[in-house]
Amino acid sequence: MTSNVMNALDKIKDLPLFKEELYFTGGTALSYYINHRISEDIDIISAKELEYKKIIPSMLSIDAKKIEDENVFALRLAGLFPDEYVLKFILDGVKIEFFYANRATQKEILKTSSFKYYKGANLKILDVKTISKLKIVALLQREKSRDLFDFGAMLEHQIVSVEEILPIAEGSKNIKSKEELLKFLEAKKEAKEDEAVYLDEANRLDLSFEEIKKRVVLQLKV
């Protein structure tokens, strides 16, 4: 985690809204456990539709700025109210995203999750296995270097096994075997506006998408 992220977490961790079913997850939460890379944003997941009437004023009270999500238009077209599904803020240069776990696979993962309190405050951080499983869902749905890198770190630290990965892959993409998963990963292409992966805050060496993908495929083949 960067110093900016740690400062942002310190500002939000005692907010009363985190007494609700909101959980710290994502790449930054994963790095809290395994310190595998620099992570520069904060993801908060909810098992139910976002209580935006509580979240928005609470975040504004600590001088966070609300920003629009790129999926707002698509959500409106689907007849949904965007603020119930995703809310994004910037706090001291750190992006903080609240999102509703509306996919069936995400809901199933959260049913068996556990958590602990971040620094003994109101903010709850999910257990490392649940964070990892949710990151796998993200990996299957989008093209991001950070998702690929995080997946490799999960394999390296033996957080999840292939036997635990495949049910998630089948539920999300009908991938039923390790061989099918390898083909899926090998076919991944870098997104046009991909976010860089850094291992060190002071020495920001950017790892390429193809380099990360090659490493992950080799790890999965072992």
Predicted segment positions?
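Compositionally biased terminal segments of proteins
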Residues: 1-222
